[in-house]
């Protein structure tokens, strides 16, 4: 079976990639509610308050939530979106989302598109099945997702994804974003005290993150022939190859044609989601590759890393690969 699968894998050709007619700078952040879209779709007073909250950490007034939600909904519907979700990072090494449609009863037997500030700011969901580190009983099921305005909303398919934190009903963090935001605030406070020794006009310290994503690409046929990969997503049996991390000739080598097509489509989709991908190359081990973006503000960079890992899985399937 394995020899036949390997033979079939060598016969596969690269999937053609449709490149947009525009330059990357023109379609960058096409599916992101960034400041350009905020300025176009929000009242000026609301835009200024939201930017002040993002840049300076000023608390948001609940009164601006309704115009923000209205502007966000208008843009999303124009982009063909039908649903929205509070998107967060539970303690499962992935992302979580629950999709709700932009529909409510209109009181006349019909439906109307609706998205209020209340729905934007906070939602209550079932948190009983998420890992919690033993901080609560399983019957205490309520969890709350709260909007993080410092990370812009984005569109995936027909869904508007709104980055949020996720906490239990007693206030404990049930995700990775809330502790990250707290640590960024702590670093900012400590760094400001040092900066004020040199310049009292310093008001904010920005934490930047330059991540890189290494990954392995495995042909779908070979992947399906390995029960350990199917069940766990990693190798648990078999012998190591004679050379793995010692393959210096593979590092920075010519990128295989099928892999190059995968990388091209991944970069196009990443740029549309506002992820500034810049570098791609072979890594050391067989079938190991790497992608790296331009560094960004820490919270945004972390969200982009989560988005791109999910994006890699989807794009890989279209090219006959599975990503490890």
Q: Can you say where each PLM-predicted feature lies in the sequence?
A:
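N-terminal hydrophobic targeting/anchoring segments and the immediately downstream early-domain regions
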Residues: 2-21, 138-152
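Histidine/acidic residue-rich metal-binding segments in metalloenzymes
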Residues: 9-117, 121-137
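Glycine-rich, acidic/polar active-site loops that bind/position phosphate-bearing ligands
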Residues: 140-324
